[in-house]
Structures are given as structure tokens and as C-alpha cells.
Amino acid sequence: MATGGEEIEPYESVPDDWNYLGLESIDKACFAIYPDQPNPLQATAVIKSWLGGPVPLDYISIYQNNGDPVRGVPTHWHYISYGFTDLYGDGRIHAFSGPGQLSGFGFELTFRLKKQESDDAPPMWPTALLNKLANYVFKTGNMLHYGDHIPWHKPLDEESESCIQHMLVALDPELPSLDTPYGTLEFRQIVGVTSDEMKMAQKWKGAGVIELMATVKEIGPLYITDMQRSESIFQIDPNLTHQVLEGINNDGSNLGHVTAVCLWIDINMSYQSEGLEAQRVTGLTDRMEEVEPQTLEGVHLLFDAEAADLLLMIARARLMKGKYFLFHNANNQSIHLIPPDCAGEEGIFVNQSEPLKFQGSYLQIYCSESLLEQMSAEFEVLQQSNNEMPVYPREFHFSEPTILITVWPQGQLMMDANYVSGELDMTAVTET
């Protein structure tokens, strides 16, 4: 019996008269790769989600891939989900769309885990991981795209002391896109990464780091996750760091939006009393189009250390490249940083003369060239690494416009502001 409302059972093909063409299409794609495994091990929901069960994915098939020594591909376990797309065509989970349209969310997730010598059977924790990601997608409606990064902040297996604690989203190198009678889908592969690899993906682009990972034999062209890997690709091959830095200089960063621990407050309000209450009230504004944008004299921005770690990259690789950046928090507050090149675009209501305006819980800040130069210089200290622990809170002051930025240790802003209940799933989404 697997955890999380799943059980392990031998694969049972669907009777022909059931005619579940979405499920059958995935089966055929898998059989083309694994013709010797027509009946793979399968994790299946004890009670399907459409019958009220807690597990969103109906099935996860698990194959043994024997690898390819010539290509540097090790033996590994290949996990393939069933449930993000329309499996049945009868509307029980996803509305029917038809050929040429997205089937359900338009993708299934896969995961490749290196087989260890001690493995007598495939580990089952990846099935729980895929279901957690499915819960996020089903509850929020936010899809996982190629190049997206998923900060996780703990070993993916939740038991070891592995440094593989985050994820990137690649395309499965072997499973093709499908056009089924119930719609189209592609297979997007979850790839476990280290903190260094995650930071590089955030600073540049997830797709670029994924391409670099394929060149390193410890990961290879099939993007194998090895929970025993102890070094990042940038430690294995220092030349890859130079490629990322060159990419940032040439392209900027593709990271345009992140959900993080952050907060904005009218600078004229007290953070401890009126400001926090005002934040709660404005956070209730769901229909922003009914509220006229209002001008602020100054704004107080609060970030935890993890979110603040992005500020230098945002200034140099986004805003100074003419690209916007959007912070979003768990209370539906948004901080939209807008460079001069984006002023005047549809939906932008700030400019040089009115640089600070808000609409409900949505804040826009016009970042002039002079402000960006100051930010680039001031935020340099956030990237300095030495043996001394930074002193918190850290403050940055800007006068044109009036902006106070306070950085708190990771986890402390959440407790002090008390504006997030439960675990925050911080998901970064790349700009397409």
C-alpha cells in the first residue's frame, strides 16, 4: 500500500467496450517505448478524485528503463501520470474539448529517477510528489510549462539529506506530443535540481539551465534525477557558470513572475497596526476593474530573504533590459515593477510623473532609469558572500519615488506579519 490514498496493483488494460480513448492514447505512447513491459507497475488512487477521493491523479505508471551506456543514460525508473488530461471523454473530470484543442490541462507529468543498487522495486515517493504537484495545478489552475522552476526547499523524497531540493520542468525526451480524440497533450518531465541550479534558472531561464544539464553525464540527455548527486552542474563543470552569465548579459532573465513571501504597505501607515489591517482589507478586492487606481506618496515593500535574493537580478536582467517583473503573495497582493520601456502599454497606469499607484491589492511602481541605477548599486550587497551572517532587518531607501524596502530572514516575515496560514507553495513561472 502506498501513501497518500494510493495503492500498488498490476496494470489492467481497459476493456475495449469502455472506449476510454484518452487513457488508451497514453498507453500506446508508453508501449512504443516499453514494448517489453505491457503490464507496468501502477500506483492508482484507492478512491478516484471524481468519486470524492483525495488523490487527483487516477494512475501513475512506473517503467524500468534500462538506459543506454553509449549515450551515458543510466538505468532508471520512469514515472508517467494519468489525470492532468481528459482520460475518459465523458466530462467526469475535464470538460470535453476534442481534437486540436487542449485535453484537460494539456499535459501529463513524468519523472525519471536513477535506479540505485539497493532498489529491489521502484521507490514510491515520486508518486506522492507528482500528486502534490497535481493538487497545486488542480486547486490553482496554474499550469506547469517547459522551463518553469518549482522551489521546494526540502529533499524531494522528504526522508534523505539529499541536496536535490527543487525542480525544473523539461519536456520528456522520449514521449511525443499526442493529438487524441479528446484533445492534445504533451509530456512534461519534472527534473530534480540543487539550490545552485535553481538560482541560476531564476537568474537566467529555466530552459537554458535544462539544456546545460543535458550536457553533464551525471544527468544526461534524459534528465535523470539522482537523489545521491552531491554537486551542482556548476561545480562539476565551472565553465557552465560562464555560459549562464553570458546568457544573462545577452538575453536578460526570462523570470517575469514569482509567488513569494512579500508585502506592500502605504508608507504613511504603521506596519504594526493600520498598515497590516489595510493590507488585509485591500487583499479582499477581487474585482480590480471596479476600483480606480489611486496615487501613493510612498510605499513600504517587505520581502523575506529568499525573495530579496532576486532583487539584483530583477534590476539588472529584467528591468534594465526593458522587461517588467511581478511579485505576488499568498494574500493576492501584487507588486508590479515597470521599466520605462513598458510605460504606456495596456494595463499600465503609472508613469514618470505618477510613479506609485495602486488598484485594490495591486501595486504598480514606475522604475525610472535613475532609480534602476540606484537599485543596481544598492542591491549588490544582497549578493555578497562572506562568512558573516547578515544582520536583519536590512533596509534600502529610495527617494524618487519614495520607496522603503525591508528584508527579513526567511520565515520571519511570515510569522511577524501573520498573513500566510499554512505552507506557502512558492512557484516561479517563466515568461513566454
Each PLM stretch: what is its role?
Residues K115-E117, D196, L371:
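Residues that cap or initiate secondary-structure elements
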Residues F111-Y146:
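Compact, glycine/acidic-enriched structural inserts
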Residues D119, L156-E158, L175, S421, ...:
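A generic structural micro-environment signature
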Residues M1-F31:
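N-terminal alpha-helical "arm" segments
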Residues I265-T432:
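Long C-terminal appendages of very large multidomain proteins
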Residues K132-L133, E211-A214, N387:
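Short, surface-exposed linear patches
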Residues P15, L21-E24, A32, D36, ...:
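Aromatic/basic-lined ligand-recognition segments
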Residues H94-D119, W408-G411, D416, E423-V429:
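Short acidic, glycine/tyrosine-flanked loop/strand segments centered on an H-E-D-like triad
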